[in-house]
């Protein structure tokens, strides 16, 4: 079912590939999903969305708000949805291509409500505030393996005082030149977000549409519901040319079947229903196939994200997206640890590597702790190192006449070493080279202060926040952007 311009299962960045399903198994998931979209269907709470579905041939029950979506509409939507689109940054060097069968990218986690702060070997977890968003954005602007910025935490100091979500739009744009992905948008305020971007482009609405420097994420309500907010984010995103991420957060054993294959069916139905709505609204609307689906721990009553199941589900979703010819955005680099510790390192590596090898286009989760509730800047810079190692693993072992190196082996001969070879010196950067992870012997490590990884990461965070320079927004333009936020605040307060 992949489009002709997409190569299912291929990832341009990796030489090692993880295949979870046969073509027949992918078809089985698809056909099971088509059954579910007709029976029981999807509950659509938004009247405007129901009308769009109805006008395009869906059966709509206005008493129950249930919409039944036939397979031919799904197939039509999948043909219309682009396999490739660009996430624009304020600085074009940060432009990021999202393409089915393209490169793997990473972004930070969102959206938590707390931050874990590290000082003198101690951890303190506190409510997140707007300044935390600014600091994390600056950190992501620096981090070479974070390709764009997703809203990491809530500005809880603004909650109830102003238009929080609108503040959460401008603050990231001001503190990173990378693309901004708004993970917590409010449907009724999308016009404000659009106007902020329009102001950035000097009032040029067409430029804002062609080069959107932000995008949005919405979540269906599992099982099988599209809320008013979700529908309005989809509809307005399509109309304004804003890329939209339809991301299911199903919990296997809770809001979806305990069998992971069954969970993929409900997940697929939820995501496809949103993608169909986007394409019925504006054919060709830019959409991701998204996932933060995991399992429900029936013994502890939690939804763990540092589990092998999350990694497997995210890898599976990447394969489903490739089957449909769509860019994917999946959870990974996830951890249930409360602080940046051994558990975090293990869980993050596992849940990153699986979807990366499956060819997910974006893996989000950098900096996340405590089942998605907490964000750590120290963990973010550690994750930046983990991603560089995963990238190296993804390259595999290239085999060619050059890399087989027969002439070099013959030249060096028996019992000698390869250190003096010109080839070795030229490829000094060929091996993996982490920034923070320590590879010294004990004596050198002790002489440098015997610092553990969290301490080294904290020092790097302080250095970046003090010294890294973000490409600024022109002062007059920023004033116009701020005026939109002020307008939203006045509307929130009823002024």
Curated annotation (Swiss-Prot):
Q: Which reaction does it catalyse?
A: Co(I)-[trimethylamine-specific corrinoid protein] + trimethylamine + H(+) = methyl-Co(III)-[trimethylamine-specific corrinoid protein] + dimethylamine
Q: Enumerate the Gene3D superfamilies for this protein.
A: Trimethylamine methyltransferase-like
Q: Which UniProt keywords apply?
A: Methanogenesis, Methyltransferase, Pyrrolysine, Transferase
Pfam families documented for this protein = MTTB (PF06253)
Q: Which GO terms describe its molecular function?
A: trimethylamine methyltransferase activity
Has the keyword Nucleotide-binding been applied to this entry? no
Q: Which InterPro entries match?
A: MttB-like_sf (IPR038601), MttB_Methanosar (IPR012740), MTTB_MeTrfase (IPR010426)
Q: What is its EC number?
A: 2.1.1.250
Q: What class of enzyme is it?
A: transferase
The GO biological-process annotations, alphabetized, read as: methanogenesis; methylation
Q: In which pathway does it act?
A: One-carbon metabolism; methanogenesis from trimethylamine
Q: What induces it?
A: Induced by growth on trimethylamine but not methanol or monomethylamine. Part of the mtbC-mttB-mttC and mtbC-mttB-mttC-mttP-mtbB1 operons.
Going by the entry's taxonomy, the superkingdom of the source organism is recorded as: Archaea
The family assignment reads: Belongs to the trimethylamine methyltransferase family.
Main function: Catalyzes the transfer of a methyl group from trimethylamine to the corrinoid cofactor of MttC.
Binding partners and assembly: Can form a complex with MttC.
Q: What is this protein called?
A: Trimethylamine methyltransferase MttB
Query: What gene name does this entry carry?
Result: mttB
């Amino acid at each position: 079912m992949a489009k002709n311009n997409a190569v299912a299962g291929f990832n341009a960045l990796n030489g090692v590939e993880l295949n979870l399903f046969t073509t027949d198994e992918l078809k089985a998931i698809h056909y099971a999903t088509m059954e579910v979209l007709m029976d029981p269907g999807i509950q659509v709470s938004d009247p405007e969305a129901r009308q769009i579905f109805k006008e395009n041939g869906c059966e709509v029950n206005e008493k129950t708000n249930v919409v039944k979506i036939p397979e031919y509409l799904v197939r039509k939507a999948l043909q219309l949805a682009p396999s490739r689109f660009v996430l624009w940054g304020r600085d074009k060097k940060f432009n990021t291509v999202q393409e089915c069968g393209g490169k793997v990218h990473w972004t930070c986690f969102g959206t938590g409500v707390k931050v874990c702060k590290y000082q003198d070997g101690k951890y303190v977890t506190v409510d997140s505030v707007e300044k935390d968003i600014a600091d994390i954005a600056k950190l992501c602007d620096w981090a070479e393996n974070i390709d764009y910025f997703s809203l990491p935490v809530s500005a809880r100091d603004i909650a109830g005082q102003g238009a929080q979500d609108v503040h959460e739009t401008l603050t990231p744009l001001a503190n990173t030149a990378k693309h901004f992905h708004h993970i917590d948008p409010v449907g009724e305020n999308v016009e404000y977000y659009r106007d902020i971007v329009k102001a950035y482009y000097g009032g040029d609405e067409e430029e804002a549409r062609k080069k959107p420097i932000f995008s949005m994420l919405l979540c269906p309500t599992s099982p099988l519901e599209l809320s008013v907010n979700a529908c309005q984010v989809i509809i307005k995103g399509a109309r304004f040319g804003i890329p939209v991420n339809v991301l299911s957060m199903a919990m296997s054993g809770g809001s979806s079947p305990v069998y992971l294959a069954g969970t993929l069916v409900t997940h697929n139905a939820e995501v496809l229903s949103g993608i169909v709505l986007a394409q019925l609204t504006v054919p060709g609307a830019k959409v991701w196939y998204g996932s933060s689906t995991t399992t429900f721990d029936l013994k502890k009553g939690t939804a763990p994200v540092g589990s092998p199941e999350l990694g497997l589900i995210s890898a599976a979703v990447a394969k489903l997206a490739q089957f449909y010819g769509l860019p994917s955005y999946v959870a990974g680099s996830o951890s249930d640890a409360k602080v940046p510790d051994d558990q975090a390192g293990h869980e993050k590596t596992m849940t990153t590597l699986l979807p990366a090898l499956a060819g997910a286009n974006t893996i989000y989760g950098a900096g996340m702790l405590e089942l998605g509730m907490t964000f750590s800047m120290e963990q973010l810079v550690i994750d930046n190192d983990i991603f560089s190692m995963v990238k190296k693993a993804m390259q595999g072992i290239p085999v060619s006449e050059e890399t087989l190196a027969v002439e070099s082996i013959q030249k060096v001969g028996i019992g000698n070493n390869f250190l003096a070879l010109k080839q070795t010196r030229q490829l000094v950067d060929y091996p993996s080279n982490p920034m923070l992870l320590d590879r010294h012997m004990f004596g050198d490590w002790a002489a440098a202060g015997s610092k553990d990884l969290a301490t080294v990461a904290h020092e790097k965070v302080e250095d970046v926040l003090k010294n890294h320079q973000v490409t600024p927004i022109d002062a007059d333009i920023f004033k116009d952007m701020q005026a939109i936020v002020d307008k939203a605040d006045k509307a929130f307060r009823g002024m």
